[in-house]
Amino acid sequence: YATSSHFSWTDATEFRKFCQDAGIPCKPLPVEEYFQPGLCDGAFLTEEYTYDAHILRDYLMEEIAKYPGIKLHFGRKITEIEKQTDCYEVTALHEGKQEAYRAPFVLNATYASVNQILRKVKGAETQDFGLKYELCEIILCKASDKIRNIGFTVMDGPFFSIMPFGKTGYHSLTSVTFTPHKTSYDATPQFPCVGENGNCCQGGFLGNCNDCPGRPESAWEYMSTLARKYMREEYAFSYEKSLFSMKPILKASEIDDSRPTVIRALSEDPVFISVLSGKINTVYDLDPFLD
């Protein structure tokens, strides 16, 4: 981690105190070994945990396989959810055919589609999550040997981070300023590209931005220029590909940049729970509801 000499909300002294107070390992490093002269007032070696989404997915699939009663249905578009006396009936479309599922427990964990799903519920009073939406880009880079096993984050302001991306062998490059391409403050995601002919988001359903012809042009030029402005030349990296995603953010989190897990119970008998988790390490807040 490094604190920028300009336009940062935090300086080196404050960052070191934060780490000490939180019990986070934080070793001061010579700034000039990693960053261009005069741009950072402190650099620190810290320890940060990450995860590989594919490994996590495979683990969960293995756990699910232990329960023969669980069936997974992919590629369904939910059109209606109706509350019955003892269950919810979920109607969905699959390959042009209508399907219906009935269950006494419904968990709405659809991330950026959470409000879209809530608006399909009938027979129960719903409330939208107070969200804004960002159409974001994470750039995957090939990193030189010099940077292969380490990551850089410059803070605390309009800066950047480049760090190992799970076990893919790539580094992810993100920027506070350039990672979000577009922002929507509507209750459900509303962007100029939504509903355009051939685009993936149609009729109240979110698509996959990576497969969409209407996805934005990459901000690689801007992000890489910002990172190279700060980093020494020997810490080289090159563009490999971009990942685009719709990111929901609680409007209440704009003040402190918090990423809580928010859980709302729509009804208890039958059960309908909606969950929006801002970061994977806060998802454990859901355990009491599942128990």
Role assignments for model-derived ranges:
Residues 97-155, 165-170, 182, 193:
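Central helical "cap/lid" subdomain
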Residues 81-84, 163-165, 264-266:
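Short beta-strand micro-motifs enriched in acidic
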